[in-house]
Amino acid sequence: MSSFQGQMEEYPTISIDRFDRENLKARAYFLSHCHKDHMKGLRAPSMKRRLECSLKVFLYCSPVTKELLLTSPKYKFWENRIIAIEIETPTQVSLVDEASGEKEEVVVTLLPAGHCPGSVMFLFQGSNGTVLYTGDFRLAKGEVSRMELLHSGGRVKDIQSVYLDTTFCDPRFYQIPSREECLRGVLELVRSWITRSPKHVVWLNCKAAYGYEYLFTNLSEELGVQVHVDKLDMFKNMPDILHHLTTDRNTQIHACRHPKAEEYFQWNKLPCGMASKTKTVLHTISIKPSTMWFGERTRKTNVIVRTGESSYRACFSFHSSYSEIKDFLSYICPVNAYPNVIPIGLTVDKVMDFLKPLCRSSQCAEPKYKPLGKLKRARTVHLDSEEDDDLFDDPLLTHSRRKVPYQVTLHPEVFSMKALPLDQPELGQSPGCCKAESMPSPSLANFVDCDESNSDSEGELETPPSLQGGLGPTTLPQQNADPDVDVPRWEVFFKRKDEITDECLENLPSSIETGGSQSPKRFSDSPKLGSDSDGESTHISSQNSSQSTHITDQGSQGWDSQCDTVLLSSQEKSGGDSTSLNKDTYKPKPKDSISASQIEQNALCPQDTHCDLKSGAEVNGVPCIEEPDTVSGRKSSPEKTSLTSTQADSQSSSDFEIPSTPEAELPKPEHLQFLYGKLATGESIVLKKENVHSQIFK
């Protein structure tokens, strides 16, 4: 049952299949087919008055619908106001407002609907877009793709809205047998019955006046028996149908509807009152085409179901099934879709919930994928690559891990290093101290994690003000460095598989000197080098030195103590082989000194390097000697001690278990006696050093 109110949103001056109330003001009327639920108000007195007062209002329909409509005397007043439009023929219609003279042009195309004889769909094209009104229709899957007038340029036209027949838009009617399947079932049953004897008769219990002509014509053609109907007036202009119908009651197939007298039911069940000439009872079966009855079944059934002793149900539908509606709507894909019928037991909202996902308006409303964009940036704090320490609000429990490039080339010649002049502030400002080059930009190299961390800006270290001031007279004398000297980069020591020359081996600290372990240790971040004031002295704790090879600061808490480190620069070779240490300074003569940045980063030696130098015979190089500065707040006693050239032998003794320094002379007995005396009394051995910082190694 149609619930369409007659007007479309895009073209409100047109009324379709509804001719009462507000539709009386329409400029044009359209009728899709001749079923009563689509003809409300068509013969009402108000419509007659409307036609009498207007000369430019017409009813548009198909030629068959016009013939069927005018066969009834009740619609004779429409005879001069009906305009038949041929199927699949685009026709321009003028919509004129007689009061104002306003005129609107639309192009109307009639498409076959497959519902009943003369039923059509209306395709409107005008200034407000393309709109399709289906009326009642039954189209099999894929049939819409063969409608050429729904296509333009090889694809479906851009349809704004579809007003759709949703009679069976219910999952209960997901699949309805096609008309061909129903015809085969009915044909088999009828043939098996009427061939028994002339007294065996079939009655087709059809409730509608139109729509079953498909069954009538096909049964008559297959069995050679005409179908009896009440009247033929409506089909007089349709010879294809008229040929298979008759008003003669003496036939075995009947589709008559209304009895003329009660007596006709005494000897038979036929409405027309047909009886046997011998007054014997006829053997009659009834077949009722229906769809709703099958939709209510909970189990799958056959196309023909026996419901009584002589009654049957045939699944025959004038309307598209649930799956056929979905196929139709998915193919044309309109912007909007509106239901013309509300199925029994459903609501408008439920029907719309089914239609919306098949429309473009719903597809456009769905959230589309797009990158987080500003949303992501709003929730993320972008930090500079050198501001890793600011990632967390709380202090780090462990030292941050620096990233250093590992794909570097090892150049052995960089181990031979000269002292830096004072006129190069970007490389070094403190005498006896050498700084490495700035790290390459992190974005230009691959990285590995380094356990050591220096300052937040490793590539832009500045000399502390305490070192830029006047240097005391006790500082180490500087060499006259070559201005073109190449300063080594500390990252070259991370290359493991390159060849290392003997000259490189001479400049590497031994594993015993570094605490007997080759694994790097964590150190506290030291943002400044040489921050201790002039006059500070270094000392060796006698308590620790008597039990281990560790060099510690008084007041420190192990290896996590914050101590500044520097590397002592070497004297010129021309200065002689002096190995004595005066009151103020200690001047060893190594071949070359190692870069301070190497010590700061506690870099691992290459794999080919002989790090465990346990005797002076294996390696003859003399590495730099490094000592820690005092970290405690108080200054050490001004006691000064000098080491003789026999220090290497004393370190290799059983008391210390430290191998002798390569190329170092043995300390003199008087120096050893002085040291042993200090150790025996538990006093601290203090070496006066100013503006010098040492790196602590295990």
UniProtKB/Swiss-Prot annotation:
Required for V(D)J recombination, the process by which exons encoding the antigen-binding domains of immunoglobulins and T-cell receptor proteins are assembled from individual V, (D), and J gene segments. V(D)J recombination is initiated by the lymphoid specific RAG endonuclease complex, which generates site specific DNA double strand breaks (DSBs). These DSBs present two types of DNA end structures: hairpin sealed coding ends and phosphorylated blunt signal ends. This is Protein artemis. One of its GO terms (molecular function) is single-stranded DNA endodeoxyribonuclease activity. It comes from the Eukaryota. Residues 449-461 have a biased composition (Acidic residues). It comes from Rattus norvegicus (Rat). Residues 445-485, 505-595, 620-669 are annotated as: Disordered. Interacts with LIG4; the interaction is direct. Interacts with ATM. Interacts with BRCA1. Interacts with PRKDC. Interacts with TP53BP1. Also exhibits ATM- and phosphorylation-dependent interaction with the MRN complex, composed of MRE11, RAD50, and NBN. Phosphorylation on undefined residues by PRKDC may stimulate endonucleolytic activity on 5' and 3' hairpins and overhangs. PRKDC must remain present, even after phosphorylation, for efficient hairpin opening. Also phosphorylated by ATM in response to ionizing radiation (IR) and by ATR in response to ultraviolet (UV) radiation. Its EC number is 3.1.-.-. It is an enzyme of class 3 (hydrolase). CDD domains: artemis-SNM1C-like_MBL-fold. GO terms for biological process: adaptive immune response; B cell differentiation; chromosome organization; DNA recombination; double-strand break repair; double-strand break repair via nonhomologous end joining; interstrand cross-link repair; response to ionizing radiation. GO terms for cellular component: nonhomologous end joining complex; nucleus. Gene3D superfamilies: 3.40.50.12650, Ribonuclease Z/Hydroxyacylglutathione hydrolase-like. Keywords: Adaptive immunity, DNA damage, DNA recombination, DNA repair, Endonuclease, Exonuclease, Hydrolase, Immunity, Magnesium, Nuclease, Nucleus, Phosphoprotein. The modification Phosphothreonine is found at T380. The keyword Phosphoprotein applies. Residues 538-551, 641-655 have a biased composition (Low complexity). InterPro entries: DRMBL, RibonucZ/Hydroxyglut_hydro. Residues 508-521, 552-583 have a biased composition (Polar residues). The modification Phosphoserine is found at S385, S650. It is found in: Nucleus. Belongs to the DNA repair metallo-beta-lactamase (DRMBL) family.
